Amino acid sequence: MSAVRVVLVEDNDTFRETLELLFGVREEIEVVASVATGDEAATVCSSLVPDVVLMDYRMPGLNGAEATRAVLTACPTTRVVCLSASVTQQEIDEVRAAGAVACVTKDEDFDSLVATVREAAAA
């Protein structure tokens, strides 16, 4: 089975770099790009066409719902998983309406996060 190709979208540099390191030791996940904004996500995804975008909800510029729409316009086959420290039900509803297939919190254990990414790719 080939690795799930993932783009990370997270404005917190430390958290984004930590995710890169953690995913880097997992053979089933390949981080193909890592960016800090939703605007960058849409641009990167249009050229890389990842399987999954793991995207923060609260970022400068486009929020998670707006960035999800932009990514899915550029790459309709890509699956988006929203990742946030805390999201309201309204934000979850917004990102789901925009096309995200899942929404998880940043305190989720890493194995569960990997499972969510794999499930999203298989959807």
Predicted regions and their residues:
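Active-site beta3 strand of CheY-like receiver
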Residues: 48-54
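Alpha4 helix (beta4-alpha4-beta5 surface) of REC/receiver domains from two-component response regulators
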Residues: 87-104, 108, 115
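Conserved acidic carboxylate
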Residues: 10
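Two-component signal transduction core modules
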Residues: 34, 53, 80, 103-104
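Short amphipathic alpha-helix used as the core "switch/output" element in two-component signaling
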Residues: 65-76
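Acidic catalytic/metal-coordinating carboxylates
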Residues: 37-40, 60-66
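Active-site residues of response regulator receiver
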Residues: 56, 84
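Two-component/phosphorelay signaling modules centered on CheY-like receiver
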Residues: 13-33
